[in-house]
Amino acid sequence: PNSASEISDKIGHIMCYGDGWYGGVYVGAMYSLAFISNDIQYIVEEALKTIPIESTFYQCISDVIKWHKQYPDDWKQTWFELQKHYSEEVGCPDGVFVPLDIDAKINAAYIVLGLLYGNGDFTKTMEISTRAGQDSDCNPSSAGGILGVMLGYSQIPEYWMQGLRGAEAKKFKYTSLSLDDLYAISYRHALLMIEKNGGTVFDNQVMLPIQKPTAVRLEQCFEGVYPLVKKGLNCTDIDT
């Protein structure tokens, strides 16, 4: 997970900071841990160690973990708790003062919501992380991706493979790359990263080094910022 955090630091800060960066760090850590563990609870909780405990991102995800234990059979109650505590975010202009939120905290929380309540069931995981709302294409994609790593490509249910197989060889618009091409590129990069970080690549298997997750630096978004009013502008408001 720490090697993934190093990449997230460079790539994530191209367009994000604070919680936006932490979203990449946390999801990257969960992907990394999914290669070495089949325990969803462990993956979710161990990956959180990469996030500073003082951050609101950490608090949000730890709350999801807490509410899951409090309401183990009711994902909707945990979702409702998230709405009450984290659905309004001052850094989301369209969502100020309304329950619309594209902030990384709550969307990462919806990934965790799907993983914890899905409990290894691919369809249930995808359903919950989608129905949670907000960024409801990326969130189930991340939840399904993490679970896919844990289960393995061949163990993804046939229902979810139907459309995928027909699309894997098709080129993305305005590019020369298909999903099959990206699989090969990602695989090659993964092997290079494994070797770079102390792992070993054999003919048909790899040996992964185990890293103890360490927290990245504290970087909090929009500290001391709170909107006083929400106002739209149109051409009649502009003095020409």
Describe each region flagged by the PLM:
Residues 9-15, 28-133:
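Accessory "access/gating" subregions that flank catalytic or transport cores
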Residues 1:
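Flexible glycine-/small-residue-enriched beta->alpha junction loops
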Residues 15-19, 26-27, 106, 110-193:
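Catalytic phosphate/nucleotide-handling subdomain of diverse soluble enzymes
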